[in-house]
Amino acid sequence: MEPKTKKQRSLYIPYAGPVLLEFPLLNKGSAFSMEERRNFNLLGLLPEVVETIEEQAERAWIQYQGFKTEIDKHIYLRNIQDTNETLFYRLVNNHLDEMMPVIYTPTVGAACERFSEIYRRSRGVFISYQNRHNMDDILQNVPNHNIKVIVVTDGERILGLGDQGIGGMGIPIGKLSLYTACGGISPAYTLPVVLDVGTNNQQLLNDPLYMGWRNPRITDDEYYEFVDEFIQAVKQRWPDVLLQFEDFAQKNAMPLLNRYRNEICSFNDDIQGTAAVTVGTLIAASRAAGGQLSEKKIVFLGAGSAGCGIAEMIIAQTQREGLSEETARQKVFMVDRFGLLTDKMPNLLPFQTKLVQKRENLSDWDTDSDVLSLLDVVRNVKPDILIGVSGQTGLFTEEIIREMHKHCPRPIVMPLSNPTSRVEATPQDIIAWTEGNALVATGSPFNPVVWKDKIYPIAQCNNAFIFPGIGLGVIASGASRITDEMLMSASETLAQYSPLVLNGEGLVLPELKDIQKVSRAIAFAVGKMAQQQGVAVKTSAEALQQAIDDNFWQAEYRDYRRTSI
């Protein structure tokens, strides 16, 4: 459902003069009307011409095109964001296909690596371990009283780049930009946070420009006590906030999610968001290839928290489609660097134990090795779906893909590792090795593949198709928790918007130009499920839709009226 055009009410603000021009959430730059310039002491502080936001956006677009590298484009866009947020979002929404990879993956990875070098202006909250006893004061310093979404990281596992210390702040900033651009959540309601618990990245510790706490990372009880202090301070300041954990190391990600998901409205996008968008993609791809997801055999390369989170949601979805839990688990095979996860493998992590295969059931496999490699698994399982979350490039070899294709005429191959340099195989190779028959979705953006004079569009299995809609649905419904069923309703809704399913051709996921429409549909499904699950107050469908409309922010200037503080 398309958003209804809302008549914007005037905004009463107490700021004037240079202070107003330095306030990114309120600054209009050259779009201040003459009346506003008189009323807010801006006469002579701006050029004579009063511009529209579209005229400003056109100038910004011309300037943007003058930058030759992606990181320079990223820096330029961040500068606009820190100067005039409304213009930033108008520009991004006008050119979302071009700019999403610049404000988020893959370019944000380079921005995190160079965070201290390219730092210009503070955004968000930096909480160092040294300041742990000032947590309440730090959050009180945030000028926005009505924060509704926080994205927090500790910078330890940034994309596939590892420990970036305080540089990890680039991820919450970028993620929240997508909450607004794709999900219509007002930037005034968002807050990026980095927990600065030190870094084990020696290059950063030796860098004279590094702006974080120069100390090895705290661990164990010290770490968890620090995070708990943060959670309690957030609950005290904004008890109804949605808290998203982002890019925490595997050893901490699942424990933190399990510890706090029933204490504060929270989720982990790397685990749950990735799982939800992947399952939505698989539902659509399975329908396009013929049949249901429950009919497919699935092999994973990568058995960390993200891979196992996806696997568990797939199992839940196939149970919804009619499988028993035992049968659903027998169809999912997890491979890590030590081979196929089996019940005989030592040192399994807690979240891996339910995803093992019984070694006794593999006695008839065609292999001479005790360690069951990815090729062994593909040869014996004959999977319909191959998913890569290994973070290692090139592991989907030609031999493996061709072996898969021998037994599956329409293989679904999803190399999801980020950034592009870490992808398990390129779409170009996968299409060629399967004679143009594979359905491919990737974690990073790729251009369409041309093979034998045919164009193959490549869908990006981008969490931005999921988390903005979840956030909007939580805000609109007032949900106090995010349940697994809410996430699965988001996946099913995403699948319903697949052009490949709807039209028999095109991308397996919607085009970015439709992402706000998809986010609004996901918000409705998530809000409705929250009501059904008892974590949100029940309302009529019309009331829920109205709440979504009311909370959907658009990048338009409002008229200002002067008031005193």
UniProtKB/Swiss-Prot annotation:
Transmembrane portions of the chain: none
Site (Important for activity): D270
UniProt entry keywords in alphabetical sequence: Metal-binding, NAD, Oxidoreductase
PROSITE patterns tied to this protein: MALIC_ENZYMES
Catalytic activity: (S)-malate + NAD(+) = pyruvate + CO2 + NADH; oxaloacetate + H(+) = pyruvate + CO2
UniProt-annotated binding residues for NAD(+): R157, D270, N418
GO biological process: malate metabolic process
Enzyme class: oxidoreductase
Pfam families: malic, Malic_M
Cross-referenced HAMAP family: NAD_malic_enz
Cofactor needs: Mg(2+); Mn(2+)
UniProt protein name: NAD-dependent malic enzyme
InterPro entries listed in its UniProt record: Aminoacid_DH-like_N_sf, Malic_enzyme_CS, Malic_N_dom, Malic_N_dom_sf, Malic_NAD-bd, Malic_OxRdtase, NAD(P)-bd_dom_sf, NAD_malic_enz_proteobac
Top-rank lineage group of the source organism: Bacteria
Gene: maeA
Record note on quaternary structure: Homotetramer.
Cofactor binding: number and manner: Divalent metal cations. Prefers magnesium or manganese.
GO molecular function terms attached to this record: malate dehydrogenase (decarboxylating) (NAD+) activity; metal ion binding; NAD binding; oxaloacetate decarboxylase activity
Family to which the UniProt record says this protein belongs: Belongs to the malic enzymes family.
List of catalytic residues: Y104, K175
Organism: Escherichia coli (strain SMS-3-5 / SECEC)
Source species taxonomy: Bacteria, Pseudomonadati, Pseudomonadota, Gammaproteobacteria, Enterobacterales
UniProt: a divalent metal cation binding residues: E246, D247, D270
Disulfide bonds: none
GO CC annotation terms, alphabetical: cytosol
E.C. number(s) listed in UniProt: 1.1.1.38
